């Protein structure tokens, strides 16, 4: 029995070595844990897209000829739009739904380096409509003919990016948020049973998707209809009542301007709110 002890001990050692080798091999064959992935960069901000168009100018050196227009802003100076404005072709005007939108524009030096001022852009507000001219071809005078995207800019704005002698320049443009001071403003025109409300000084999208009105004698909102440009109308009799507006911009943000118009209002008055789209 004593002679068998060394042999048994040797056998146990060999067994332990074999088991250890098997465990190491199994560990090597097992799949390794996944390597932690680095977080992907945020895709919340989409790079701005630049689109091609052309631009001409009108209105004179002081832009006085751009007053009025198909959006209904009348005096662009007093409304805060100034000389940084443009008339849009049919492809961009969208039957007036684009009124108030803002566009950053740069002269396209790749297409016309001799007529571009380098390294500058200008931001303009859509305040007018550039009608088509069917008597002229789209590439020779009929610049605003569909489906061409075209900006007929106020001359001072155009001259920020282009050389005057060119007359027309190729441009790159993109929609940008509108920056405004103060709140949204409402100007009431029309007459009894026809309330025509001009909405101005709209920030962010610059334009309005839908609008409702409510008189102080009711608790029901009544939808308004875009009449032309930035003017919305209601056929209800609201004279002598305080007026509230519910306005939704093109991004879907809704603001309620409750009793923004006092009961003693008159046609032709403008009422400035303290609320603004963000």
Curated annotation (Swiss-Prot):
Alphabetical GO biological process terms: plant-type cell wall loosening
Database matches in SMART domains: DPBB_1
Glycosylation sites: 217
Record's keyword terms, sorted: Cell wall, Cell wall biogenesis/degradation, Glycoprotein, Membrane, Secreted, Signal
UniProt topology in membrane: Peripheral membrane protein
Functional note: May cause loosening and extension of plant cell walls by disrupting non-covalent bonding between cellulose microfibrils and matrix glucans. No enzymatic activity has been found. May be required for rapid internodal elongation in deepwater rice during submergence.
Family, similarity comment: Belongs to the expansin family. Expansin A subfamily.
Official protein name in the record: Expansin-A24
Organism: Oryza sativa subsp. japonica
Taxonomic classification: Eukaryota, Viridiplantae, Streptophyta, Embryophyta, Tracheophyta
Record gene name: EXPA24
């Amino acid at each position: 029995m004593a002679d068998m002890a060394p042999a048994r001990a040797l056998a146990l050692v060999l067994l332990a070595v074999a088991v250890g080798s098997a465990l190491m091999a199994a560990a090597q064959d097992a799949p390794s844990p996944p390597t932690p992935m680095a977080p992907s960069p945020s895709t919340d901000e989409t790079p701005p897209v630049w689109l091609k168009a052309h631009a001409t100018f009108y209105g004179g050196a002081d832009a006085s000829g751009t007053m009025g227009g198909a959006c209904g802003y009348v005096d662009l100076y007093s409304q805060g739009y100034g000389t940084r404005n443009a008339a849009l072709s049919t492809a961009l005007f969208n039957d007036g739904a684009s009124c108030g939108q803002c566009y950053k524009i740069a002269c396209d030096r790749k297409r016309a380096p001799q007529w571009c001022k380098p390294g500058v852009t200008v931001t303009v507000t859509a305040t007018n409509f550039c009608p088509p001219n069917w008597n002229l071809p789209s590439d020779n005078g009929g610049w605003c003919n569909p489906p061409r995207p075209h900006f007929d800019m106020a001359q001072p704005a155009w001259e920020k990016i282009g050389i005057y002698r060119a007359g027309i320049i190729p441009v790159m443009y993109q929609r940008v948020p509108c920056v405004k001071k103060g709140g949204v403003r409402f100007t009431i025109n029309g007459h009894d049973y026809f309330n025509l409300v001009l909405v101005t000084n709209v920030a962010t999208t610059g334009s309005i998707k839908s609008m409702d009105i409510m008189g102080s004698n009711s608790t029901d909102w009544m939808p308004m209809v875009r009449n032309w440009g930035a003017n919305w109308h209601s056929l209800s009799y609201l004279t002598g009542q305080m007026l509230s507006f519910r306005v939704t911009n093109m991004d879907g943000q809704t603001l309620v301007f409750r009793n923004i118009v006092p009961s003693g209002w008159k046609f032709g008055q403008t009422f400035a709110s303290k609320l603004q789209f963000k």
